[in-house]
Amino acid sequence: MKNLTSFITIIPISIMLFSCSTIPKGINAVTQFDKAKYLGKWYEIARFDFRFERDLNNTTAEYSANDNGSIKVVNKGYNTRTNKWKSATGKAKFVKDETIAMLKVSFFGPFYGGYNVIALDKDYRYALIAGNNLNYLWILSRTTTIPAAVKTEYLQLAQKAGFNINELIWVKHD
């Protein structure tokens, strides 16, 4: 009976965890997305202060295609507290069609979080990324800097979507 009760408790929790939306309500992912153009190295320009990235500078994300259609994700940054490089390897999968930039990413087993490209310039040089709620936001660039006009545009988009842009950490690249 105890096992049945545990099983019955686990099912609703599992359904809730795995059926949650990967994008905040009212926000749309980029459409007409080209996965091949997005792959490669990106520099993290700004982010919210997440436990898993705390004290990291020189932060990058590198995306490459896996044979099964998923995307290999390698995040790397220099920990200024320990003076050591830290990296994490995971995988990303499209939630819907590959032309919609709504993905889920995992760095640990079957547990996925939202990864949504919500703004992207036509040349795939700058990207604004939202997680599955308003607590996750990144600004990425193909270089270690971003033009002031792009920064202003992305901050306005994020603020309009409900993100608290005053909480962003601006990543140092040196």
Residue spans for each PLM region:
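A beta-rich soluble binding module of mature secreted/lumenal proteins
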Residues: 16-174
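Bacterial N-terminal signal peptides that target proteins for export
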Residues: 1-8
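Bacterial N-terminal signal peptides
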Residues: 9-16
